Design a protein with these regions (language model features):
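A short, aliphatic-rich alpha-helical micro-motif
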Residues: 36, 185-187, 207-208
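Short hydrophobic/charged patches on amphipathic alpha-helices used for structural packing
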Residues: 27-31, 181-183, 205
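Phosphate/diphosphate ligand-binding glycine-rich loop within oxidoreductases
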Residues: 15-96, 224-227
Length: 258
């Protein structure tokens, strides 16, 4: 991802500097980058610790330079389904690059229905997200649910449902725990999105609904080769779109700074 980011940012005329920092020096490095007027955006490659300390690092990044949108400020906006940073709605909140890339891919291939009202473009869609990391899977499930989908969020421990609370005064999602198994929910899904960072993991093709949209955002292929025989659309990677979203976030932050 770092190499791809560097290449594509350079092609767009944007400077990318990879700083390899020992873990024990990372906090100081983030603070230095926050104060450096020559730095327009900061991207930390996670996981660093693989626990809640990573969230502490995310919250250390200055929101005006947080190109991944993982700071508590942007998290609050995402999970509260509030797209703007200001009351006048002139500055949009930054969204995490990979979840945003998946959303853009789904929109491009026609999963989003723009004949429905704004905020309901995924109404009637059932989607599985096989990954619940704080960096990708959880925010992706929230984004999809906030757009009206019923989302089965699947990780190694359990399956949770993310969906809009139609009775609530705000238009954000609620989360319900379930006792479902993967084989219970995957056949119900119009879209199956995988992001398991293991070459040994494969989504069983036999579980997939005929005509399903299958999207993989992991660095390895999570679907079996036979997926092409079942899926109406199969997207094996969103890496290039993710880098495009990184560029988009960076340019948006640069405009906010100036």
């Amino acid at each position: 991802y770092a190499q791809s980011s560097s290449k594509h940012l350079a092609e767009a005329g944007l400077e990318f500097e990879l700083r390899q920092i020992p873990r024990e020096e990372l906090e100081a490095a983030i603070k230095d980058a926050n104060q450096d007027s020559n730095v327009s955006g900061i991207l930390v490659y996670y996981p660093v610790y693989g626990d809640k300390r990573d969230q502490d690092l995310q919250d250390m990044v200055d929101p005006t330079k947080d190109v991944e949108g993982l700071n508590v400020v942007y998290n609050g906006k995402l999970y509260g389904n509030d797209r703007f940073l200001d009351e006048d709605k002139t500055r949009k909140a930054i969204l995490p690059c990979t979840p945003l890339a998946v959303v853009k891919v789904l929109d491009h291939i026609g999963v989003y229905d723009h004949d429905l009202p704004y905020g309901d473009h995924l109404r009637g869609k059932t989607i599985a997200v096989v990954n619940r990391s704080e960096v990708v899977g959880r925010p992706l499930a929230a984004l999809l649910a906030n757009d009206g989908a019923k989302v089965y969020s699947i990780d190694i421990n359990d399956i949770q449902i993310f969906e809009r609370d139609q009775a609530a005064s705000i238009n954000s999602h609620v989360i319900s725990k379930t006792d479902f198994k993967v084989e219970d929910v995957i056949p119900l899904c119009d879209v199956v999105i995988t992001g398991v960072p293991s070459a040994g993991y494969k989504m069983p093709t036999k579980l997939l609904k005929p005509g399903v949209v299958a999207v993989n955002f992991a660095s390895v292929r999570n679907f079996e080769p036979e997926v092409k025989e079942v899926a109406s659309i199969y997207v094996p990677s969103v890496g290039k779109v993710t880098v495009s979203m990184l560029q988009r976030n960076l340019l948006r932050l640069f405009n906010y700074q100036h």
